Amino acid sequence: MDSVNSFKGYGKVDEAQDLALKKKTRKRLLLLSISVVVLIAVIIAAVVATVVHKNKNESTPSPPPELTPSTSLKAICSVTRFPESCISSISKLPSSNTTDPETLFKLSLKVIIDELDSISDLPEKLSKETEDERIKSALRVCGDLIEDALDRLNDTVSAIDDEEKKKTLSSSKIEDLKTWLSATVTDHETCFDSLDELKQNKTEYANSTITQNLKSAMSRSTEFTSNSLAIVSKILSALSDLGIPIHRRRRLMSHHHQQSVDFEKWARRRLLQTAGLKPDVTVAGDGTGDVLTVNEAVAKVPKKSLKMFVIYVKSGTYVENVVMDKSKWNVMIYGDGKGKTIISGSKNFVDGTPTYETATFAIQGKGFIMKDIGIINTAGAAKHQAVAFRSGSDFSVYYQCSFDGFQDTLYPHSNRQFYRDCDVTGTIDFIFGSAAVVFQGCKIMPRQPLSNQFNTITAQGKKDPNQSSGMSIQRCTISANGNVIAPTYLGRPWKEFSTTVIMETVIGAVVRPSGWMSWVSGVDPPASIVYGEYKNTGPGSDVTQRVKWAGYKPVMSDAEAAKFTVATLLHGADWIPATGVINQLS
């Protein structure tokens, strides 16, 4: 198996359909001050009118039809990629007899939850039908991801219920909903990736009835999730196009819960001054702390805590694999320096572990902060996919950390993440994932791979056009780690809507003049990708010989680049300053 042909790959892209859907939602309405719910109802009416006009091929406009539950649902679903499944699934629910768009959106969430709940035990059932450990492992990954998706969706419904008490759905809450639904899309896709990567070892896996049965069973929830994401994304787009200002509430990391005000005061004052900080648990391998291992400290973290729980890890190398599940909220872990406090593991794909589970350190719970720690996967290039660090933590920050490995070193899987002054070392796709993530002031260092391999720094995995994910590398440095003679590229698009921007970064001579490479050799990526460069410097920044892809812009405008700043991509002004970490919002 050629290690460069990892499990990641393109799916089908229906660009014409996506373009048509976008046109349907770009409507101009003349409105005065009006509640969000009424505004959306008017938008729905306008969309319905447009659909009717187009169907009748009318040359002159006519008054919009009466707003009925049926026309409302049709209009809501018309902005989705799968309108038929949207209409059929929601219309079956008893409470669907409404014209209220927010209610219809909540019903779309109920559809996903019901569907995922009905198949949540399927991975475990299918696992009993095989003795193959690789298949069992992939099914276990899918089971965990389905559970995570269900938990996130229930949190989403709770967030909407809390917001309804305020009689409005703020733009910041809409961003939360988009993020969480984007992560649910990623959960589905990661399950499929875990099943697909089985093909790397044995060709018979490609025709496995067990894996095909699970994929088939998850097809409906995949469409339903995309539908809900499209609904909330298009509503936000309509409001934005109209220029209607929406009150943005100040919020910290607890999102739909009232976050303790103690955190902001504590974080601003102490995050950058850890020398005087009193941790809740101290880890020391020499016995001078409260516990000997990081895992022992993690076990002491309370579930879904609204107050910051602090773990201090003293200098030393801790050989262990750490997993912090979705119930571990608001945890800070810090060490004595990225070269002094090291957490080391060696799990890898070649030896039988799914890529998703190879991480030396994995975090799912929201509000995570890591400082002055090094994470390493020592498996080496010959072991192919071997993740050092994986994060699905929403509103997470990584400061002065290092992530060291070869293929697939750093995995910003989903949600919103910020990396500042960190070091990342690797070979193939060594920063990959589907999070909304910004790297600032980081040192990104490709290293020499195996003799038959190349280096690709990024592999972004946006699967759905409405996902709020993307990768931004801003004001960083890209340079070789040691003597690198292998062909080295800024990245390659992993999925149909992959989104990656390199901006204001010093690019070293290690990067080939073409800059980027296709996932499939000789085949340009789809035009639906969003790739670009902006005001980079250094010997590798010359764009005159760059690839000529339809979805790539070698010279982005100021306005285009602004979409990939901390302020815009992460809405970082709402939460990053509270952590005390240095950042540039623009």
From Swiss-Prot:
Disulfide bonds: 422-442
Motif (RRLM cleavage motif): 250-253
UniProt: substrate binding residues: 355, 385, 492, 494
Site residues by UniProt (Transition state stabilizer): 407
Biological process annotations from GO: cell wall modification; cellular response to hypoxia; pectin catabolic process
Main subcellular location of this protein, as a coarse class: secreted
Mutant lacking the gene: phenotype: Reduced number of leaves at flowering time in long day conditions.
Enzyme class: hydrolase
Locations listed in the record: Secreted, Cell wall; Golgi apparatus membrane
Pathway terms, separated by semicolons: Glycan metabolism; pectin degradation; 2-dehydro-3-deoxy-D-gluconate from pectin: step 1/5
Glycan attachment residues as annotated in the record: 57, 97, 154, 201, 207, 466
The entry's keywords: Aspartyl esterase, Cell wall, Cell wall biogenesis/degradation, Disulfide bond, Glycoprotein, Golgi apparatus, Hydrolase, Membrane, Secreted, Signal, Stress response
Active-site residues annotated for this sequence: 408, 429
Positions occupied by motif RRLL cleavage motif: 269-272
Free-text tissue specificity from the UniProt record: Expressed in siliques.
CDD domains assigned to the protein according to its UniProt record, in alphabetical order: PMEI-like_3
GO CC terms: endosome; extracellular region; Golgi apparatus; Golgi membrane; nucleus; plant-type vacuole; plasma membrane; plasmodesma
Swiss-Prot/TrEMBL catalytic activity: [(1->4)-alpha-D-galacturonosyl methyl ester](n) + n H2O = [(1->4)-alpha-D-galacturonosyl](n) + n methanol + n H(+)
EC number: 3.1.1.11
Domain notes: The PMEI region may act as an autoinhibitory domain and prevent untimely PME activity during transport. The PMEI region is cleaved by SBT6.1 (S1P) in the Golgi apparatus prior to cell wall targeting.
Family label: In the N-terminal section; belongs to the PMEI family.
Subunit details: Interacts with SBT6.1.
Cited function: Acts in the modification of cell walls via demethylesterification of cell wall pectin. Demethylates protein phosphatase 2A (PP2A) that have been reversibly carboxymethylated by LCMT1. Acts as a negative regulators of genes involved in salt stress response.
Official protein name in the record: Pectinesterase 1
Organism: Arabidopsis thaliana (Mouse-ear cress)
Gene name in the database record: PME1
